Amino acid sequence: MEVQSNLKKIQELYKEYKINKKNIDDNWISFFDDLTEEAADLLEGNSNHIISNNSQSSNNNSQDNEYTANSLRARLLIRAYRIAGHLKADLDPLELTEQKYIPDLDPKTYGIDDNDMEKEVFIDGVFGINTITIRELIGILEKYYCGKIGVQFMHIQDKEQRDWIMDKIENIKPDEIFTKKGKQAS
């Protein structure tokens, strides 16, 4: 039920975004601006229009709709890690405090369960990748946003600055950060 409620809220935000962007938070504007046509159709409730007008079986429609829905869920999860990943960063080497549960970073919040982990999703070039399994995506998100360094940048109002930081975070391999190559200014 919570997932449907979240999706309804996102659909309402999207409707408002289409009417008047000024009433929407900049983070959501950025998210909606980046949506593919298929994901936008899903948010508008036009899932029947996601498939081309070729005569395809309802089974194919169902699979394509599920793929699109999972891809949208993956994009929501990426957005959540960009906003709140720093809250889960490993900043306590002595482990003196217990790591808090962050619902926004839980795939179940977006309707992703254990059965979905091996499903491929389209993430449209994020991390230089177009398609990836949800399990692999979560691994990358954890590595980039929840490692030994926490990065908080989504509050920055200037989209150009925010995109620059995001590009720097998401286009360096985490394993290279502290190598000689990784320390060089890019």
Stretch-by-stretch model annotation:
Residues 1-186:
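Conserved internal helical-beta-strand scaffold that buttresses enzyme catalytic cores
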